[in-house]
Every structure is written in C-alpha cells, then in structure tokens.
UniProtKB/Swiss-Prot annotation:
NCBIfam families recorded: 16S_RimM (TIGR02273)
Residue stretches spanning the membrane: none
InterPro entries per record: PRC-brl_dom (IPR027275), PRC_barrel-like_sf (IPR011033), RimM (IPR011961), RimM_N (IPR002676), RimM_N_sf (IPR036976), Transl_B-barrel_sf (IPR009000)
Taxonomy, superkingdom: Bacteria
Family per record: Belongs to the RimM family.
GO cellular component: cytoplasm; ribosome
Name of this protein: Ribosome maturation factor RimM
This protein's UniProt keywords: Chaperone, Cytoplasm, Ribosome biogenesis, rRNA processing
Protein species of origin: Caldanaerobacter subterraneus subsp. tengcongensis (strain DSM 15242 / JCM 11007 / NBRC 100824 / MB4)
C-alpha cells in the first residue's frame, strides 16, 4: 500500500453546496492550493480519491474545500470527522531534521542513557518551536523540539533519543 500523510481533518460541512471545513494538520495550509486531489479514508479504512475544485483559507486558519462529487450539505456531512490525506507524490518534501507529525506519533522516546521515558502522543505547534508531548507512566513530559534536546530520530524504527535538560 502507498504511503499517505494526514493533511487535515474534516470538522463540519460549510454551506449547502457541499463545501467542507477542514482543520489543517500541516504547518503550511496554503499547500491545499497546490494539491490536485485528496484521499479520504472511511471508517473501514477504504480510500476514496477526490479532485479538489476550490480552496479558501479563512482568517482563523481553517481551510474550506469543495471536492468534486460532494455537492450537497448531506454529502459533506458524511465526511465529518474523517482525515484528508495526500499520497507520497503530493507530500511536501522535507528538509533535514524535519518530520511528518504522523511519523512522530507513537514513537518510543529514550534518554541518551537508554532509559525509556514514554511514547510520543502529540505535537504542539507553539510558534517558536514544536513541543513533543510524551506520555510517561504517571505523567506527561513536554520536550521542546530543538537540537539541544532531540538527538536522534529513527522514523523506520519509531524511536527517538533525547537529552533531558535541567527541569524537564
């Protein structure tokens, strides 16, 4: 099966002509202007390909999409809660030390000494730098995504090695 990457989640229908309101899961919402089609996976994980007919980005950072074949509010309602994905061909090309959030979620996080901290569960986008939320046994550990802390990321092995700074 091809690789697919989440780029948004449908939050609700918008209007009566089949538009959908999408919460972008990318730090570049404008990329929707350049994507010719999107993949939607239903509850049974069956993919369906939709051509993007129109894109608008709201002042609040949400994305409004009109997909070919989704022509009514009822059609749009059926997509509510589903993730929009791009295939590898349409994925953004990453720079060194950049990762797709979907690749980071679920990683086991270890200290440089080999001690398991926990599992990376969420990425907070704060502006200055991302913050990784790691679920430990009895608490959450917040790790700034900076070179001083993140020492190694093994996407294939789903492992991250970190150096804990004073106070973390």
């Amino acid at each position: 099966m091809a690789d697919y990457y989440n780029v948004g989640k449908v939050t609700s229908p918008h209007g009566i002509r089949g538009e959908i309101k999408v919460y972008p899961l990318t730090n570049v919402p404008e990329r929707f202007y350049d994507i010719p089609y999107i993949w939607v996976f239903d509850e049974k994980d069956i993919p369906c390909k939709y051509e993007i007919e129109n894109v608008k980005i709201t002042s609040k950072g949400m994305v409004l999409l009109k997909l070919k074949g989704i022509d009514s509010r009822n059609d749009a309602e059926k997509l509510k809660g589903l993730f929009l994905k791009v295939d590898a061909e349409n994925a953004l090309k990453l720079e060194e030390d950049e990762y797709f959030i979907t690749d980071l979620i679920g990683m086991k996080v270890y200290t440089e000494e080999g001690e398991l901290i926990g599992t990376l569960e969420e990425v907070l986008q704060t502006g200055a730098n991302d913050v990784y939320v790691v679920k430990a046994k009895e608490r959450e550990v917040l790790l700034p995504a900076i070179k001083e802390v993140i020492k190694k990321v093994d996407v294939e092995g789903k492992v991250m090695i970190v150096r804990l700074l004073e106070g973390l």
